[in-house]
Amino acid sequence: MDLTTNLPSGRRTYNVILKTPKMKIYTKTGDKGLTSLIGGTRVAKHHIRIESYGTVDELNSYIGLIACQEIEAHHQIILKEIQDRLFTIGASLAADPEKSKMKIPDLLEEDILLLEQEMDKMNEDLPELKHFVLPGGNTIVSYCHLARCVCRRAERLTVALAEGSFVDTKVTVYLNRLSDYLFVLGRKIGDDTNAVENIWVPRVKS
């Protein structure tokens, strides 16, 4: 049975994971350090698959934090789209590739292309980057850098997971592009808010 029919995309992912529209938040089934993947497989909560989609969830929270700031409406729209895609990725990573028969939302090539197009548009208005940039400038820019670092961690974990289990290659590509997008977004927001972009000057002994 496809539980995703006629539900908004974000709700679809939650219903895929929870399998029912109404369920208690606490189940007590994880009290001994195990949790269930989509498909029913029980694994330790420190399993790399759990680490992977847990880090994607952490990333999504940071994306939400950025979207709540006073930034351009267009950026907010794109960030909400990214949040939806991260739920899709979370559902994909939470499914046991060998046992899950439930329909999981799809990540598309168009989702990756959107990030690339957004980066290209933002870069048109930015000064050429000739040096490494120190994270910071103002609070919102710093949030972008925090999200970027969490995104890189999520990417590293999914790459490690893919060495021993199936992971849709579009997932790792999307996370790679997203970390770049967050870097460019931070620069764009910094430029729009007249934040100082501090460059890294290596200290070299003469």
Report the location of each language-model feature.
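Short Gly/Ser/Thr- and charged-rich N-terminal loops/segments
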Residues: 4-14
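Phosphate/pyrophosphate-binding loop motifs in nucleotide- or prenyl diphosphate-using proteins
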Residues: 18-206
